[in-house]
Regions:
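Adenine nucleotide-associated cytosolic modules
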Residues: 1-127
């Protein structure tokens, strides 16, 4: 059982008030491990929402760097991030939204040579 801090109670109060979530559900969320494949058009907003919800661990796999052309649709990256690996840019924003979230980054492609080793550590995969 997690002993929620006052800050966590306030942060997650809307979840905790929901009959279908409550304290037990928020605890499950905070213990969950989710892998996001790609920090681009889908992975960017998904990562932000997962962090805001309090997912305990978010893994991000992406072998790309932020390009200026990404910024109009990949909301996790900012102009200052151009040239930075997307996983590092995403990690910074996730930690800014919710410092309690653990972020695991994989600056590589997810393919047959590494997929099983990476995904076995996670409860859910978003691709």
């Amino acid at each position: 059982m997690i002993d929620f801090t006052e800050e966590q109670i306030q942060r997650y109060s809307r979840h905790i008030l929901l009959q279908d979530v409550g304290v037990e559900g928020q605890e499950k969320i905070m213990n969950a491990r989710v892998l996001v494949v790609g920090a681009g058009g889908l992975g960017a907003p998904v990562s932000l929402y997962l962090a805001a919800a309090g997912i305990g661990t978010i893994g991000i796999v992406d072998a790309d760097v932020v390009d200026l052309s990404n910024l109009q649709r990949q909301v996790i990256h900012f102009t200052k991030d151009v040239g930075v690996p997307k996983v590092k840019s995403a990690e910074e924003k996730i930690k800014a939204i919710n410092p309690d979230v653990k972020v695991e980054t994989y600056y590589e492609f997810l393919d047959s040579s590494n997929a099983l080793d990476i995904i076995k550590e996670y409860d859910f995969i978003v691709d």
